[in-house]
């Protein structure tokens, strides 16, 4: 029974990361639209779709109770901060995909686990073991040396990594179930998204006359929610270190799409930075597996 649940966990989690990795192909279908327009529609339609999901899961009451609880314990600010951070992350990713920065976007999600560890040290007083300390140092050195030697700072990668890392940090303060969390986050930011579309006059997207653009924008909400729901189902069946290993599926797919589908240049500065990050991730993953085995032996 346990083996069957673990197998399900691997499948759900792997599929969620594959979907995230393939996202660039989807955003490219909407590249005629400004990134802010795509973001606004993504927020709105994600909220609409998640409301439908909560209705069928019969979790409306739970969602309302969670919102009231957040109001009482002061968690609304953390929820709003999380919604701002995930919106920044979505915007930067969409912009990066449609402006030829796919390789940097993939680098951002390779860096993310290391950034999350760094944020844990700074804000949660977590401690690193020696291997993790070396891993974070190698990654930081790679970015810094690349900046000085090649004059190339991976702004997109750093924005994606830190916005998502800070998003994860803010979510630790709310501890909401994933479906309810996404619903409330999009609910919090939706007035801004609606206001932007109304005041910019971009409610009607370019090419919407055929209906194809509207369909793609609506499905952006569906495809935002689906991998998240699959990930939630998978992650609860797997130990954290296995999820940590599987998460590299998404940036690897994105990297391959950038290189072989859209033929983005792989410069010497990118090669150096990626090499440092991959070396750091190998050490980091090894330290997680080693820690897991040590904890089992005790």
From Swiss-Prot:
Coiled coil: none annotated. One of its GO terms (cellular component) is plasma membrane. Keywords: Cell membrane, Membrane, Repeat, Transmembrane, Transmembrane helix, Transport. It is found in: Cell membrane. SUPFAM superfamilies: Multidrug resistance efflux transporter EmrE. The chain crosses the membrane at residues 10-30, 36-56, 76-96, 101-121, 142-162, 179-199, 212-232, 243-263, 271-291. It comes from the Bacteria. Signal peptide: none annotated. It is a multi-pass membrane protein. InterPro entries: EamA_dom (IPR000620), RarD (IPR004626). Residues 17-148, 162-286 form the EamA domain. Belongs to the EamA transporter family. This is Uncharacterized transporter YojE. It comes from Bacillus subtilis (strain 168).
